[in-house]
Amino acid sequence: MNCEVKHALHCAVLVAWIVCFAYFCGVFTEPAEGTVPESPVASYGLVWTICLYLLRFTALLVLPQCLCNLCGLMMFNAFREKVQLKAAPLLSPFVCFRVVTKGNFPLLVKENIDANMKTCFEAGMENFIFEVVTDKAINLPPNPRVREVVVPTAYRTKSGAKFKARALQYCLEDDVNILQPTDWIVHLDEETLLTTNAICGILNFCEDGKHQFGQGVITYANGDIVNWLTTLSDSFRVADDMGKLRFQFKLFHKPLFGWKGSYVVTQVEAERDVSYDHGMEGSIAEDCFFSMVAMKHGYTFDFIEGEMHEKSPFTMWDFLQQRKRWLQGILLTVHSSKIAVVHKALLALSLYAWATMPLTSLQVFLCPLFPLPRCLPFDFLLSFVGALNLYMYIFGVVKSFSHKYRNSFLRLGMYLAGALMTIPFNILIENAAVLVGMFGRKDQFYIVNKDIQTV
């Protein structure tokens, strides 16, 4: 089955799933007589009726994100397995792979640098260097293609940026930066592993040179899986990359909903112009804040073909803390006076949809207990949101575990069942992250342990 057939099948299944889900939710059928009050105000009272309708409308805050995911998943083929180079690697621009770390896991960094460098050579890459930016010296072995940059303890940015933003800004200082304005930087987390496809996609993007920033897909199920629960939960993020992220970059060339902090490709001149020096509000989710400022400056973005590999958090506590930091960082970004509403409007809707999850989750119990009169367009949109979000888990598993279930439909079925079983856990964790994030301290940067040797 070639990639075109797979994509056509996926589109047909997605549309059928959305329609069937709406049908089984009763969107197209009239409720049994006497089960739905004709006047909710008379049955529930004015205040409670308003609350019920507000909850329904709140559930649609995520609609723009769902529509972008739908368009991204249907408009672009996600099943092409090989990325073709458009030009010889020898003629490609100079690329710096930059890894930022606290220095707590030196062995992990060393092993991944070696593995990634080997992948670069296998892809035929010549013009590159790896730069490890660390708070603590990790004493990498001497190598002309590896540069270790230790951020001085006394270093302070002009605005007081902290954590990863501070380290990234240090690399851009005149007396530290060794790159030319036309060179390119690929930002990686300390556990990120390159693939030949990702390198080909990066070289194509850099060679094209039309856009200053780019990003691709990260999957989390390669190699040994430490925690199946968190890995299956992260399958949603893979589908989100293939849907919303791809759609916003391919069609609009703007980070309308923000972007991730890894597998980030930037042109040096543009990155130095935008900078990471945006104070405390730009230090918790420095990636998201950076993308908003770059969009404000008029820079353009594109989607990069080829995937990279990372690990999901190893523990439920790390999973919770990771989500909490994302929520707090996006909250600070959305509420920043430095970014105009026109640039952060869709990001804000996405944030508020996330922040109101504890309330919208209650509808699972409230809808059967307090039914409201039918409104076909409104009810269909609600069922569409639910159907698409469920499908995202399924699609994410199909993409993430493709190397593990080849020629085994039984194994694929097990992975899909596992993903669906993790949904209640994921909802619980996301709700807990919202509560902890909204009412907890917003000046902390939790570092997730991705070193498998410490587990």
UniProtKB/Swiss-Prot annotation:
Its main location: cytoplasm. Pfam families: Glyco_trans_2_3 (PF13632). GO terms for biological process: carbohydrate biosynthetic process; protein glycosylation; response to toxic substance. GO terms for molecular function: beta-1,4-mannosyltransferase activity. It is an enzyme of class 2 (transferase). Keywords: Cytoplasm, Glycosyltransferase, Insecticide resistance, Transferase. Its EC number is 2.4.1.-. It is found in: Cytoplasm. Pathway: Protein modification; protein glycosylation. The keyword Glycosyltransferase applies. One of its GO terms (cellular component) is cytoplasm. Belongs to the glycosyltransferase 2 family. Glycosyltransferase with a proposed role in glycosphingolipid biosynthesis. Involved in susceptibility to pore-forming crystal toxins in conjunction with bre-1, bre-2 and bre-4. Involved in resistance to the nematotoxic C.cinerea galectin Cgl2. Has a role in determining brood size. This is Beta-1,4-mannosyltransferase bre-3. It comes from Caenorhabditis briggsae. The gene is bre-3.
